[in-house]
Amino acid sequence: MIDSDGFRANVGIIICNRYGQVMWARRFGQHSWQFPQGGVDDGESAEEAMYRELYEEVGLRPEHVTILTSTRSWLRYRLPKRLVRQDSKPVCIGQKQKWFLLQLKSQDSAINLSSSGHPEFDDWRWVSYWYPVRQVVSFKRDVYRKVMKEFAVTALSFQTQEIPRKRVRQRTTG
């Protein structure tokens, strides 16, 4: 669904774990990392699109997550001119996104990047909460900064455990 301004309706998904970390995924066959996201189909609500994309991109079902919050409004970013497909009608100049913050209730092993048969991602990892703002492709950075700021209090308040630290071996002399 592309609106009259040329923005495609899209949902963004931030999945957090009990350590206050967020899931960060690498685009299939590329070196770029991002949060899961995807388009909203005609007749589909943003929440329905989020659950569909959640399964298609990372193999998680509603029973694996809890919705903690969503953005108050749609956030927009423009695509760089080199990525705008001028031959498509209507022309899509960017995305308008409704973002969802989810808490993972299941084990990490429930994450399956190949669940749809057409993987969007080929790797994933847990990263510190603010890490994606610095690492995402530049044209998405402002939206990432806004959504992470809006979700920060909620996301970090659901941190229930400290990240396990690697034990440092102590040498004994003698």
From Swiss-Prot:
- Could you give one GO CC term from the UniProt record? cytoplasm
Q: Which InterPro entries match?
A: Nudix_hydrolase (IPR020476), NUDIX_hydrolase-like_dom_sf (IPR015797), NUDIX_hydrolase_CS (IPR020084), NUDIX_hydrolase_dom (IPR000086), RppH (IPR022927)
Q: Which SUPFAM superfamilies match?
A: Nudix
- Residue positions of motif Nudix box: 38-59
Q: Name one GO biological process term.
A: mRNA catabolic process
> So what EC number does this one have?
3.6.1.-
Required cofactor names: a divalent metal cation
Domain of life, per the record? Answer: Bacteria
The answer to keyword Zinc applying to this record is no
* Chain ranges of the Nudix hydrolase domain: 6-149
PANTHER family for this protein: M7GPPPN-MRNA HYDROLASE
NCBIfam families in the cross-refs:
PRK00714.1-1, PRK00714.1-4, PRK00714.1-5
In its UniProt entry, what is this protein called?
RNA pyrophosphohydrolase
